[in-house]
């Protein structure tokens, strides 16, 4: 059975309620601080060099295709081995990616933030550095005034952190999973912050994505527990068996 939409309405409500609203507010406030203090522009001037761009380039493709390929690979592995846990993990990752993309797209459609200049042309910064004008304040609030590709928060970052934190919530006792998840999320996020996004878009995406991933992860973790132990009985050895 497809569990991609398992408790979806409840999870959406959870993302935008209680403490999670405070985290969302912190993403907004942190963005305002970084932008108004000149942090975005300073970070942009410091990081737009060839070496950073070359290291970050693979993340642009990874961040675009992994949200689809990763859940599919886990799902195929789970179906092939008839492993219910892997199948549930695949649906959890899929929902985390879906919600992160949906929420990010809605935010971008409203905030309409202009992207950093010279996308993919890091070498031009050194040649024209003195003539550059700070464009980090370029928000176009409204609806679809800046499209849904560029903008606040970073979609690559939000989806990466959402999937990573979802996986960590499901396998939180596994040091390998925790390390892999965090490395993946930070690589994607930092990579886009030195190429196609402002630094504040990375920070906001990391916060919002973490909230989404933890919410979805908790939801599917409950599903795993209930299916593993009918009747809702807890098992102290569950985490140890991860």
Model segments located where?
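Aromatic-anchored segments of alpha-helical transmembrane domains
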Residues: 30-37, 100-105, 183-193
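Structural signal for the C-terminal ends of transmembrane alpha-helices
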Residues: 8-9, 37, 75-85, 170-173, ...
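Hydrophobic alpha-helical transmembrane segments
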Residues: 24-26, 90-94, 177-182, 203
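Membrane-embedded catalytic cores of phosphoryl/pyrophosphoryl-handling enzymes
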Residues: 128-242
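Alpha-helical transmembrane spans of integral membrane proteins, capturing the lipid-embedded, hydrophobic core
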Residues: 24, 28-29, 93-101, 105, ...
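Interfacial segments of alpha-helical transmembrane regions
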Residues: 77-109
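N-terminal transmembrane-helix/juxtamembrane module of multi-pass inner/ER membrane proteins
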Residues: 1-74, 108-143, 236, 240-241
């Amino acid at each position: 059975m497809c569990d991609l939409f398992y408790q979806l309405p409840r999870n959406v409500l959870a993302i935008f309620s209680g403490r999670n609203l405070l985290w969302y507010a912190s993403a907004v406030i942190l963005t305002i601080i970084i932008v108004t203090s000149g942090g975005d522009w300073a970070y942009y001037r410091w990081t737009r060099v060839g070496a950073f761009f070359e290291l970050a380039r693979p993340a642009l493709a990874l961040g675009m295709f992994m949200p689809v390929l990763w859940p599919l690979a886990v799902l195929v592995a789970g179906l092939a081995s008839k492993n219910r846990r892997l199948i549930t993990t695949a649906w959890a990752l899929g929902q985390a990616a879906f919600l992160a993309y949906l929420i990010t797209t809605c935010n971008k459609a409203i905030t309409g933030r202009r992207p950093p200049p010279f996308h993919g042309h890091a070498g031009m910064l050194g040649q024209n550095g003195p003539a550059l004008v700070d464009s980090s304040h370029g928000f176009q609030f409204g609806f679809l005034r800046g499209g849904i590709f560029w903008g606040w928060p970073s979609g690559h970052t939000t989806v990466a952190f959402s999937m990573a934190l979802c996986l960590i919530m499901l396998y939180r006792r596994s040091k390998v999973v925790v390390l892999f998840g965090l490395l993946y999320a930070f690589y994607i996020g930092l990579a886009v912050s030195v190429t196609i996004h402002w630094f504040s878009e990375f920070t906001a995406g990391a916060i919002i994505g973490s909230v989404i991933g933890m919410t979805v992860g908790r939801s599917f973790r409950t599903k795993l527990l209930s299916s593993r132990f009918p009747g809702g009985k807890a098992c102290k050895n569950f985490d140890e068996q991860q």
